[in-house]
Amino acid sequence: MRNRLILLPGWGLGVSPLEPLANALHGLNEHLRVQIEPLPVLDSSDVGEWLDELDATLPDNVWLGGWSLGGMLASELAARRGERCCGLLTLASNPCFVAHDSWPHGMPAETFDAFLAGCHADSQVTLKRFGLLCAKGAADPRGLSRLLVSGAPNTPPSVLMPGLELLAQLDTRAALQAFRGPQLHLFAGLDGLVPAEAASDLLALLPDVEVGLIEQAGHAFLLEDPHGVAGAIQAFLYECVDD
């Protein structure tokens, strides 16, 4: 099923931000089957449980990809599946979402802790703030933020919190190093959630994979320019299949 790509969304905003990209990819290659799968709905932030759910739900021998948290989970699942995964692509996915000593270019821990507390107190207000950060760096940040938040499912805090806690726990560096299939990782130069410097850090960690930086774009670049992103993905897929 080398003509099938599974895309996983980011935290809190549902599948709608990925739909324009999926349509653009299909427009470029009618033989490519693009499937957007929602994140698991679990009351646990245990990484293994999330991966077990995804592994049981998603088909084998496909390309795995995702945006932000979805890309982090796709990375872990690709490493788990090994040769049962055709390849991996991530969009605005930091190997470590929260910064720490060995990975300084992430969200400051105190900022993340405030997010976590805010989500516990009022998840809808926190989601709006998250939407604004996703739209930071866009040509029309307010319009993009409204689009992101308006398309988000009405998710209770009990479902949002485990995903947010998962963001803080995940460190995909070992998974990315272990996965031997082709990889493409795209970052944004004006991202308000994933510092642009993470792109060069990842390239230093994985010098043999493709890492791209879209200079004038924010975290939701897949929604800002779905056709441009689709073109980069299609070129990557074509190159890998051609090899």
Residue ranges of each PLM-predicted region?
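Conserved HGGG/HGGXW glycine-rich cap/lid loop of the alpha/beta-hydrolase fold
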Residues: 1-47
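The conserved beta1-alpha1 loop
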Residues: 8-11, 67, 187-188
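Conserved alpha/beta-hydrolase "acid-adjacent" motif
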Residues: 16, 192-198
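Gly/Ala-rich beta-loop-alpha elbow adjacent to hydrolase catalytic centers
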Residues: 66-70, 74
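Flexible "cap/lid" loop of the alpha/beta hydrolase fold
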Residues: 85-118, 159-160
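Conserved alpha/beta-hydrolase catalytic His-Asp/Glu region
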Residues: 120-170, 174-175
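Short beta-strand/loop motif that positions the catalytic acidic residue
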Residues: 179, 185-187, 191
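Catalytic histidine-centered segment of alpha/beta-hydrolase-like enzymes
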Residues: 217-230
